[in-house]
Amino acid sequence: MEVHGDEVLSVDSGVSTPPSTGSGFRRPLETPGTEIGNLNLNPQNEVAVVGMACRLAGGNNSPEELWQSILNRKDASGEIPSMRWEPYYRRDIRNPKILDQTTKRGYFLDHVENFDAAFFGVSPKEAEQMDPQQRLSLEVTWEALEDAGIPPQSLSGSETAVFMGVNSDDYSKLLLEDIPNVEAWMGIGTAYCGVPNRISYHLNLMGPSTAVDAACASSLVAIHHGRQAILQGESEVAIVGGVNALCGPGLTRVLDKAGATSTEGRCLSFDEDAKGYGRGEGAAVVILKRLSTAIRDGDHIRAIIKGSAVAQDGKTNGIMAPNAKAQELVAWNALRTAGVDPLTVGYVEAHATSTPLGDPTEVSAVSAVYGKGRPEGNPCFIGSVKPNVGHLEAGAGAVGFIKAVMAVEKAIFPPQTNLKRLNSRIDWGQAGVKVVQETLEWPGNEDDVRRAGVCSYGYGGTVSHAIIEEFAQQLQRPTTNTTDEDPLPRILLLSAPQERRLALQARTQASWIAAEGRNRTLESIATTLSTRRGHHDYRAAIIAENHDDAVQKLSDIVNGKAAEWTTSSRVLDASCSKDVVWVFSGHGAQWTAMATDLLKDIVFYQTISRLDPIVEREMGFSALHSLASGDFESSIKVQVLTYLVQVGLAAILRSKGLEPQAVIGHSVGEIAASVAAGCLTAEEGALIVTRRANLYRRVMGAGAMVLVNIPFVDMEKELQGRTDLVAAIDSSPSSCVVSGATEAVLALVEDLKSRGVNAFRVKTDIPFHHPMLDQLSEPLREAMAGSLSPRKPRVRLYSTSAEDPRSMVARDIYYWTSNMVNPVRLTAAVQAAVDDGLRLFLEVSSHPIVSHSVRETMLDLGVEDFTVTNTMARNKPADKTILSSIAQLHCRGAVVNWKKQLPGPWALDVPLTTWDHKPYWRHIHTGPISASTLHDVDKHTLLGQRVPVAGETTMVFTTQMDDQTKPFPGSHPLHGSEIVPAAALVNTFLHATGATTLSNITLRVPVAISQPRDIQVVVSQNQIKICSRLTQKAGSGADEGSWLTHTTGQWEAGGSKNAPAQLDIAAIKARLANNKLADNFSIDYLDKVGVSAMGFPWAVTEHYGTLQEMIARVDVAPDVPATSPLPWDAASWAPILDAATSVGSTLFFDQPRLRMPAHIHGVQVYTTQPPLKVGYLYVEKAGDRDLAVHVSVCDELGTVLARFESMRFSEIEGTPGSNGSEESLVHQLAWPPAIYSEKPLTINNVVLVSRDKNVADLYCGSLKDRVSSITVLDAAADLLSLSQDSSSVLQAKDTAVVYVPGPLHSADSIPTAAHSFLMELLLLVKIIVNGSLPTKVFVLTDRVCESESATALAQSPIHGVSRIIAAEHPDQWGGLIDVETPGQFPLETMKYVQEADNIRISDGIPRIARLRPLPRDKLLPPSKQTSLLPRPESTYLITGGLGALGLEVAQFLVEKGARRLILVSRRALPPRREWADILADASSSLAPALETIQALEAQGATVHTLAVDISSPDAAPQLAVAIDSLSLPPVRGVVHAAGVLDSQLVLSATSDSVERVLAPKITGALVLGTVFPPKALDFFMLFSSCGQLLGFPGQASYASGNAFLDAFATSRRHQGDNAVAVQWTSWRSLGMAASTDFINAELASKGITDITRDEGFRAWMHISKYDIDQAAVLRSLAFEADEPLPTPILTDIAVRKAGSASSADAPSAAPKETNEMPESIPERRTWLDERIRDCVARVLQLGSSDEVDSKAALSDLGVDSVMTVSLRGQLQKTLGVKVPPTLTWSCPTVSHLVGWFLEKMGN
C-alpha cells in the first residue's frame, strides 16, 4: 500500500458485521467528580504508532504474517529444538531424568541462534557471547524502523528512547556458570540492560535506554514508558517492545512446579480445558512518535495510543496470585488518561495466560470495566494472541499490542484460536464481554471511532493497560493503479553494509516488484527506497522506466551482469569529503538535439523561458527556438546557448535534490559556475554572455584553437616569445589547448604531426583566451557598466582565470574581461579542490568535454578513490543521464535530498532488509560437572565415567580435561605447552585394569592441556589405550574431530608372578660413595635442559650416581609432615613414578638433552599396599639400549615395591631453557656492536633543542662543515613557530631534530629535572606529529647507561619513554643515543644505525640493546646465592605493600623465613576491632589484604602497616620516624613495589598525568635511598617493568618511571649496595600489569608471555644467585624458523620452532599460500589486500576472508582492542614487516593498511 501523511488503504474483508455498539452508551466513570467525554483529538498529546515488527514462532516474522496466522487460527506450538537443553543433560547425572519430565513443548523460533552479526559489525566471537535476546532485538528493531519509514541511520545522535521488556537470563546462566570459560564480553552480552543498550549503541541513540523487567507485563510497561518519554518531551521517537528466548530449562522447571505451564505446551485461552500456558519466544518492537510529529513527517499512522497506565496489585493471596480489583483500577486509570468512555471500546486484547485462576479473574475485571452497562447484543469483544504464538512473557504485552493495532487498523475482530468450549468458571451471560469465535467486521457507524484495550500482567503483581484507537483523520483511498503512472524513469536505490549483500537485496526487491509490487507505482517504490530506508556504505542504483525494466535490472545485479543505467559502488572512505564539485565546461559540448529532452522538463523550460527575453533583446534570436531546432550555426550562438543549457541543468539538478558544495568553471563555463555559486543571478550571467558574444563578432574568423598532447608548461616554454600563438587552456597534466591566428595554428598542427604528437582542431573560428581578444575588454566594460552586483559565493568557488584558484576576487566586469583573455587554468583548479579533500566531480554540460581531463589530473595527483561523472552525453536520453549522474554520486556518498525529487506517497509494503543469518551459540565445554562423571584429579588418573559397551571384554572410561582438571598438582611444560606426565598415564593404566603387571607401553604423543579435550581410556582383553580429541565446538557434528591415540599398552590379570627383589641400599651407597651428587642434581639438570617444573612435588634428599647407576632417596611430599595424610589419594603411584621417570632420565648426564619416556618394556607392582611417602629409586643402565634404564622403587629397607623394566627415552628437539626454565625466564641487557646500514639516512640539516648553551655550543662545533645548516633552539616550544614557516628546514625530509637535555648539578633536583626533561621531549614530539612534519626526532643523553651521576639519573626516564615514542610514532622517531663523550655529535651513528630505538656509544663504538641469558661470570659462589632472601632475625619493608603484588611478595618472604614485615601504603588500614566486620563483607576491597595479613600472622610472622605516601618529597623523615616507632630489628631488605599505572598515549600525556606516575617511582626510590643509605641493606629490590624495553604503547609515563628505577639500581650498585631492578613481564592476575585479554594480546604482539606467581618467585630465586644490577623477567614465544621478530631486542633469546608445521586446530580462515610479492603496483595491492583480509578474518574467526570488507572500518567489522593487538601480530608474521601499535588508528580499514604496507614493503 502507498501512504501520504494523510492517507491509508482501506481493507475489504468480506466478513459479517455484528450489531453496532453505538455512541449512545457512553457513561461517566465510577469516580466522583470525574467524567469521560468524547474528547477531540489533540495531536500534541497523543502518541502515534508508526511502525511495528515481530519475529515469532511459526514463521510469523512480520505483523502481517502474524495477522494471517490469527485469521487462520494457526497454533505454532512444537517441540523444543534438541540443542537447547543439551548442556544440561551433561551437567549432573540426575538431570536427564528430571529434564525428561519437564515440559518440552512450547512456541519456539526455528533458529534462535541465527543472527546477522556482520550487518551490525559484530565479530563472531562477540556474537557468540551475546544473548539471543539482544540479537533478536537488534534485527527486529531495524525492521520496525523500516516499517515506520524511518531510516535507522537518520536517528544517529538523536535522543530517541529505547524501552525493552526482558526478564529471561537463560543464556546468561548458560555462559556465566561455565566458570572456566567466562570472558569479558559476556557481562554486557548477557545483561538485561544489554537488550536496549545494544540498540542504542548500534544506532548511536542518546535518549533513555532502559530494560524493563515487570515479568509478563514488561513489554506493555515498556510501551507505557515510551509514551511518557514522548509526551514529556524527552524523546521525539521511542523504540519499545519486548523479547524472550528460552535457552535453558531452569525457568520452565520452576513454572512446571508452580503449575503455571501446560503439560501440552499450548495456550488454550478462555477454554474449559485450559490448565496453564505454553511458553513462547520471539521479539516484538513498536515505534512511537508524538501524533503531531508523525503527521508532520508524513508517517503512516497505524493507531494512536490514547492512554496507558501501570500499577501493582498489592498484597494478594500470594505474590503470584492475580487481583481482579487491581486489574480493574489500572484499566480505569488508562481510560481516564485517554479521556475515553469504556463503552466506546469495541475490543480488548486480554493477557489470558490459560491458567485456571488467571483467565476467570481477568475476564471478571474486563467485564467490570468494559461489559457493565452494555445493552444486550452489544458486547465488548475479547481475545488473546497467546494460542497462536505462545506466552512470550517479557514480550507478551507487545505482541498483544500489535494484534490489537492490526484489529483496529483493519476493522476486524479476529477469531480466537484453540477455543473449543468456553470456560465454565466464567459467567459469560452476564459479563458483557464476548470471545471472538468467528472473524467479524468491526461494527459501528461511519462516525464511530474504533478503539481497543490491551491488558498485560506480571506474576510479581505488575498490572498494565493501554487504550488505542484508529487514526480517524486518515482518509480512505484505494490502491493506486499503476496504469495511470507517468512513464518517467525513476531511480531505485539499494544499499548494504557489505558488497555481497547487494545481490541479496536486489533479489528480494526483484521478486517483490515482479509480484505484489506491480500494484504499487514505480514512483512510490522509488520514494520508499530513497526517503524511507537507510543508506549503507555499499550502494547500487538503477534507472528504470517501468516494473519489468526494474525487475530486469535488479536481476542483472543479482547475476553480476553490467547493465546500462545501473551503477554500484562503495561510498568514499570516511576520511574523504562527500561534497560534490560542479564543473561547468566551456565551448565544445554542443550537439544538435541536446535540448530536445531537456525542454520537456518543466524546470528547465521555465528557466530558459525566464532568460529568453534577455537573449532576444541582446542577440536578436529566441533561445527557446534555437534550442528546440538545434540551430547552433556560429560560435557566438554556441556561447550563449551553452550558458543557458548549463543554468537550466543546474536548476534541474537542484529540483532533484542535488546541491553543489564547490564549483569550477571552465572558460565560458565560469559564468554559469558563478551563477551556481550565488555570485551572480542567472539574469546577470545572461547579460555577460550575450553582450560578450556580440563583441566576439569583431574577431570571428580571426583565429583557431587546437588541443595538443603536450603539457601546458612545456607548451608555454615552446611558444615563449611568440605573439601569434599562446598556450590558452591547461586542460590536464598531459594536454593543453593552443589558441592563435589561423595560419599559425594550422602550421603548428602540421609541425606536431611530423613530430608524432596528436593534435585536434577545436570547432571555433574565434581564438578564445588569446591576447588579440584584449581589444574587446574596454568595449565589454562599457557595455556592462552598472549591470552587475556581484556577491560573495555561497559555496567554494575555484577560479580558472586567476593564478590562485582559491582567489576570492569579486566576479565583477574586470573579472570577466580577464576570463576572456587569460589562460584557463583547469588543472590548477582541480588540484586545489583535490588538496581541499574533494573527490566527487560532476560535469554540468550537454556532453562531457572536461571529465577526462579531471580524471587525468586526479590520477596524476595519485588519487585513486574518486568519481567524475557528467549530466548528459551526446545522443543519450537526458532524463536518464541526469538521474544516472545523481545515482552515481549518491553511491559514492554525496548528499541528495530525495524528497525534492520524490515528494509523493511511499509504499508501505516494500520488502525490508534481507538478513544473512549464521548460527552463533556458545557450546559449553566444561561439563560434566558431577564428581561421578569427571575424573578425580587427586587420584592422578584420567578415569571418568565408565560407559557400558556391548560385550563382556571391553570397557571405556570417558572424561573431559582442561587446565582446571589436569590429573597432577604441579606444572609440566614442554616447549611452552603443558602435558600430562608419563607417570599419570601409567597410573591410569594401573587403576583402569586393576593389574599389577603392564607391558609394552608405548608413549606415542603427549597429552596436551592447552585446550579442552575429550578423553577415552579403552580397556579390552589384554590391551589398554588412552585417546583424546579436542572438545567439539558448537555446530560440529557428533562424529567430527579426529581421535588421537596417545599411549598404548598391555596388561595381565592377577597379582605379580615374581617375588619382590631385595636391594642392599647400604652396599649401593658404599659403592657410589665417591660419586655423591647434590640433592637437587636432578631438578637442576632437568631445569637446564628445559623442564622448568615438575608435575609432582617430590624432592631428592640423598643422591649418588655415575653414568651406569644411581640411587636417590625421594620424598614425594617434602612439605607434608610424616604423620600427616598426603594431599592426594594415597593409592596413587603417580608421584613416586614421576620421580622414577625424571631421575631415570638424568642417568645420561654426560649428554645433557631434553628426553622423555617413549617406551617401557614392563611395569611391575609387587605390593598391594599404598606407595610410601619416602623411598629409594635405584636406576641402572639397561644393557640392551643406549638410552634405556631400569628403575626400581623400594622402601628404606631395600624391598622393591615397583619396577620399570627397560624404560627407553627419546630426545626432544629444542633449545635448553626454551620451555620455562629460569634460564629462559631471566635475562639481562647486553650491548653488542651495532650493524651499519648500507643505505644511510640523509641528514643535511640539524635543529638542536637544548636549554644548556654550553652543550649546544659544543655540539655545534662538532657539526661544523658536516651538515648544510644548524639551527639552535632553547626550548621545544620554539619549534612551534618554526614549524609554521613553510620555508623552514622542518619541512625538509633531510632534517633531524635533536633534543639534548642539559646537565644537573644537584641530586636534590633529580625529580624536578626528570619531569622537565620528559615534558620537553613529549612537547617536541607532539609538535612534529601534529604538524605532520617530515623530520625525525633524536635524543642525546649523557652516560645514562653508566648511571654514575645525578645528570644520568635525571635523564634516565627518557630512555624509557623513547621506546614508547618509537612504538607509537615510528615514522617520526630517529633514535636515542647515549653518548660517552658529550660534545662529540654522533652524526654517523644517526645516519647508519637505523634499526635500533636506543643506542649506546661505548669505547667509541655504537652498540644496540639485546636481551641475553644472565652471564655465568656474574654467578655468585654457592654460599652467597641467597643474596635476595630474608633472614628470620631481620625486618623487611615492602612499598605498595597492600597491593595485590605487594601482598604476594609478603607471602613469599614469609615462606622463605621472614618473620617481621612492614607494609607501606598510601592508605591506612582500619583498627583491628573493625576487621571482623570488614571480612564479613564479601564486597569489601580491604578484605583480601586483611585475610592475607591474618594468614601471615598465623604462620608466625609479625606484620606492621604504615600509611606513608612515599611519592611525597618530605616522606623520608616521616618514614624513618614511623619505622623507629615500631622498635623492630633493623630493616635489612626493601622491596619497592609501589606504583601508579595511568595508560596514556604520548600525544595525550599531560604534566599532571606524567607526574602522577613518576612520583611513586622516582621520588619513592629516592626517599627509600635516603632512609636506607648505601650498604645499610642486605638487598634493595626495585620492581620495574619490561614495557620500556619492548615499547608498549600507552605507557609513556610508566616506562619513564621504570627506566629511572633501572638506572637507580645501577647507581646504588656503584655505591656498594646489593640493589637490583627487576623488569617484570605481566603477572597473571596480579599487580598493575595483571594479565587481561588485552594485555595478553599486547604481550603476544611483542613476542612474549605473562608469568605465574610461582614463575615470578622462581625467577626471584634465580636472580638471587647472580651479582647483577638489572634483570628482565619474561618468556619468549616460539617463532617459526623464518618468522620476523616483533622487536630486535629479543634476537638472542627468541625461541625458534624446529619446523613450520601448521596447527591442526587453526581457524578455518587459513592464510593463503605465501608467494613472492608481485612487481606491479596494482598486483601488489591485490596481493596485500588478500593477505591482510586473511589476517583480519583469522582474528575475527570468520569462515572466509571474503567476509572482510576492505573499505569498512575495522572497528565496524568487530575488531576490538584485544583483536587489534592480535591483528598486529598476524600482520607481522604474514608480511614480515614490523607493525607499530598505533597503525590501525591511522589506517582504520584494510584499504588503508594496503597503502601503508605498499609503501613500507616498496622501500
From Swiss-Prot:
<feature type="modified residue" description="O-(pantetheine 4'-phosphoryl)serine">
    <location>
        <position position="1761"/>
    </location>
</feature>
<keyword id="KW-0808">Transferase</keyword>
<feature type="region of interest" description="N-terminal hotdog fold">
    <location>
        <begin position="940"/>
        <end position="1058"/>
    </location>
</feature>
<dbReference type="GO" id="GO:0006633">
    <property type="term" value="P:fatty acid biosynthetic process"/>
</dbReference>
<feature type="domain" description="PKS/mFAS DH">
    <location>
        <begin position="940"/>
        <end position="1218"/>
    </location>
</feature>
<dbReference type="InterPro" id="IPR020841">
    <property type="entry name" value="PKS_Beta-ketoAc_synthase_dom"/>
</dbReference>
<comment type="function">
    <text>6-methylsalicylic acid synthase; part of the gene cluster that mediates the biosynthesis of terreic acid, a quinone epoxide inhibitor of Bruton's tyrosine kinase. The first step of the pathway is the synthesis of 6-methylsalicylic acid (6-MSA) by the 6-methylsalicylic acid synthase atX. In the biosynthesis of 6-MSA, atX utilizes one acetyl-CoA and three malonyl-CoAs as its substrates and catalyzes a series of programmed reactions including Claisen condensation, reduction, aldol cyclization, and the hydrolytic cleavage that yields 6-MSA.</text>
</comment>
<feature type="compositionally biased region" description="Low complexity">
    <location>
        <begin position="13"/>
        <end position="24"/>
    </location>
</feature>
<keyword id="KW-0521">NADP</keyword>
<dbReference type="InterPro" id="IPR013968">
    <property type="entry name" value="PKS_KR"/>
</dbReference>
<feature type="domain" description="Carrier">
    <location>
        <begin position="1726"/>
        <end position="1801"/>
    </location>
</feature>
<dbReference type="Pfam" id="PF00109">
    <property type="entry name" value="ketoacyl-synt"/>
</dbReference>
<feature type="region of interest" description="Disordered">
    <location>
        <begin position="1"/>
        <end position="40"/>
    </location>
</feature>
<dbReference type="Pfam" id="PF08659">
    <property type="entry name" value="KR"/>
</dbReference>
<dbReference type="InterPro" id="IPR032821">
    <property type="entry name" value="PKS_assoc"/>
</dbReference>
<feature type="domain" description="Ketoreductase (KR)">
    <location>
        <begin position="1434"/>
        <end position="1628"/>
    </location>
</feature>
<dbReference type="InterPro" id="IPR014043">
    <property type="entry name" value="Acyl_transferase_dom"/>
</dbReference>
<dbReference type="Pfam" id="PF02801">
    <property type="entry name" value="Ketoacyl-synt_C"/>
</dbReference>
<dbReference type="InterPro" id="IPR049552">
    <property type="entry name" value="PKS_DH_N"/>
</dbReference>
<dbReference type="InterPro" id="IPR020806">
    <property type="entry name" value="PKS_PP-bd"/>
</dbReference>
<dbReference type="InterPro" id="IPR014031">
    <property type="entry name" value="Ketoacyl_synth_C"/>
</dbReference>
<feature type="active site" description="For beta-ketoacyl synthase activity">
    <location>
        <position position="216"/>
    </location>
</feature>
<dbReference type="InterPro" id="IPR016039">
    <property type="entry name" value="Thiolase-like"/>
</dbReference>
<feature type="active site" description="For beta-ketoacyl synthase activity">
    <location>
        <position position="351"/>
    </location>
</feature>
<dbReference type="InterPro" id="IPR016036">
    <property type="entry name" value="Malonyl_transacylase_ACP-bd"/>
</dbReference>
<dbReference type="InterPro" id="IPR036291">
    <property type="entry name" value="NAD(P)-bd_dom_sf"/>
</dbReference>
<keyword id="KW-0596">Phosphopantetheine</keyword>
<dbReference type="InterPro" id="IPR016035">
    <property type="entry name" value="Acyl_Trfase/lysoPLipase"/>
</dbReference>
<dbReference type="InterPro" id="IPR042104">
    <property type="entry name" value="PKS_dehydratase_sf"/>
</dbReference>
<feature type="domain" description="Ketosynthase family 3 (KS3)">
    <location>
        <begin position="44"/>
        <end position="470"/>
    </location>
</feature>
<dbReference type="GO" id="GO:0016491">
    <property type="term" value="F:oxidoreductase activity"/>
</dbReference>
<dbReference type="Pfam" id="PF00550">
    <property type="entry name" value="PP-binding"/>
</dbReference>
<dbReference type="InterPro" id="IPR014030">
    <property type="entry name" value="Ketoacyl_synth_N"/>
</dbReference>
<dbReference type="InterPro" id="IPR049900">
    <property type="entry name" value="PKS_mFAS_DH"/>
</dbReference>
<keyword id="KW-0597">Phosphoprotein</keyword>
<dbReference type="InterPro" id="IPR050091">
    <property type="entry name" value="PKS_NRPS_Biosynth_Enz"/>
</dbReference>
<feature type="active site" description="Proton acceptor; for thioesterase activity">
    <location>
        <position position="972"/>
    </location>
</feature>
<feature type="active site" description="For beta-ketoacyl synthase activity">
    <location>
        <position position="391"/>
    </location>
</feature>
<dbReference type="Pfam" id="PF21089">
    <property type="entry name" value="PKS_DH_N"/>
</dbReference>
<feature type="region of interest" description="Disordered">
    <location>
        <begin position="1701"/>
        <end position="1721"/>
    </location>
</feature>
<feature type="region of interest" description="Required for catalytic activity">
    <location>
        <begin position="1783"/>
        <end position="1803"/>
    </location>
</feature>
<feature type="compositionally biased region" description="Low complexity">
    <location>
        <begin position="1701"/>
        <end position="1710"/>
    </location>
</feature>
